[in-house]
């Protein structure tokens, strides 16, 4: 089922008549030597896609891959946004689609 916004044309989105959107929120931070730094994003996005495939009219918004992870500052290459920037990204994302669909977050 074609429901991933970033893989669709504007025409396909319009024809799909989406009424709901799910946004996965992850991170890119250290999880030890055995798990990818992006596992939070990968799991949240996979679940979002599985949910959307089961719910009529649900669109999958591209994942938000970096969030507030200041508690991982001591680990190399853990990416973080400031708290205020994280809130601003979430707010702006919501504002972009709020008038068109019901929004569901998955983290």
Language model region names:
Residues 1-103:
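N-terminal catalytic or cofactor-binding beta/alpha core of small enzyme domains
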């Amino acid at each position: 089922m074609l429901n991933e916004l970033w893989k669709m044309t504007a025409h396909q989105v319009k024809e799909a008549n989406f009424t709901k959107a799910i946004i996965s929120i992850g991170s890119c931070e250290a999880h030890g030597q055995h798990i990818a730094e992006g596992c939070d994003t990968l799991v949240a996005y996979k679940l979002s896609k599985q949910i959307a495939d089961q719910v009529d009219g649900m669109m999958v918004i591209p994942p938000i891959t970096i969030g507030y992870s200041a508690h991982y500052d001591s680990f190399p290459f853990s990416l973080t946004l400031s708290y205020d920037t994280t809130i601003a990204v979430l707010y702006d994302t919501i504002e972009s689609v709020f008038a068109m669909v019901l929004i569901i977050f998955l983290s």
